[in-house]
Amino acid sequence: MSENQQALNHVVSMEDLTVDQVMKLIKRGIEFKNGAQIPYEDHPIVSNLFFEDSTRTHKSFEVAEIKLGLERLDFDVKTSSVNKGETLYDTILTLSALGVDVCVIRHPEVDYYRELIASPTITTSIINGGDGSGQHPSQSLLDLMTIYEEFGHFEGLKVAIAGDLDHSRVAKSNMQILKRLGSELFFAGPEEWRSQEFADYGKFVTIDEIIDQVDVMMFLRVQHERHDSGAVFSKEDYHAQHGLTQERYDRLKETAILMHPAPINRDVEIADHLVEAPKSRIVQQMTNGVFVRMAILESVLASRNAN
């Protein structure tokens, strides 16, 4: 069993993945996009547990599982024993005892997965579909796949991440891996939403200072549900100060691309008519989410088979 397989018993944080593992997942995602197939004759079982709302992550994991021919065990939080007070640990312990091979989990608690992967009793592999404002590895990997398809490399690329930085698991996951891959990072958005941890990975700027220099302009959703009611800007003020207006779009380099993890607050982070503009890769990101999640599932299942 290779070191790479051993490390991918779980995929919970970009910090836990080596650059080599990341590149293998990206390239495997591209292979799946180009038509590669893998038949699973032993019918591994995957359960998706989403304790927070999701469309893209939840449904693209489901499509990835269907394309791989995996067995899906539906889990509805609303009708489960969670509503009787059952803990997440006991829920996963139960699914593990039932023979579920992989659990894809989104949960509001940061680092929820640490207790699960440390348990000697839980044998199910964990894929983190997002933990509060912590990590979102599969989103980061699909973003990387989209950038790699465009440029063929990461070294030397100027990447700006703009918006609700503090509350964004996407920003944290991407900044950690992009710095290791050799990209130059810039962070823009309201000063109230910039924690000092970002300074270790890049430079704080205003969007107008950097918009005409970057190769990748990545906007983040304003996460109203994670803010105190008094902390939210008006939509109009936010868009004027920090969003992608037509004037800012026109200043982007000829080769620059526009990204957003979605869902998008139209006319807040990005002007409505620019969401599908020629430089936008937002739809491509969604498409790539299926294929990179196929690669993640394949790698985790390969590790289980090797054990």
UniProtKB/Swiss-Prot annotation:
Q: Which residues bind L-aspartate per the record?
A: K84, R169, R221
The question of whether Magnesium is a record keyword is answered with: no
Q: Does the keyword Transferase apply?
A: yes
Name the record gives this protein? Aspartate carbamoyltransferase catalytic subunit
The membrane-spanning stretches of this chain are none
Q: Which reaction does it catalyse?
A: carbamoyl phosphate + L-aspartate = N-carbamoyl-L-aspartate + phosphate + H(+)
Q: What does this protein do?
A: Catalyzes the condensation of carbamoyl phosphate and aspartate to form carbamoyl aspartate and inorganic phosphate, the committed step in the de novo pyrimidine nucleotide biosynthesis pathway.
Q: Which SUPFAM superfamilies match?
A: Aspartate/ornithine carbamoyltransferase
Q: Quote the subunit structure annotation.
A: Heterododecamer (2C3:3R2) of six catalytic PyrB chains organized as two trimers (C3), and six regulatory PyrI chains organized as three dimers (R2).
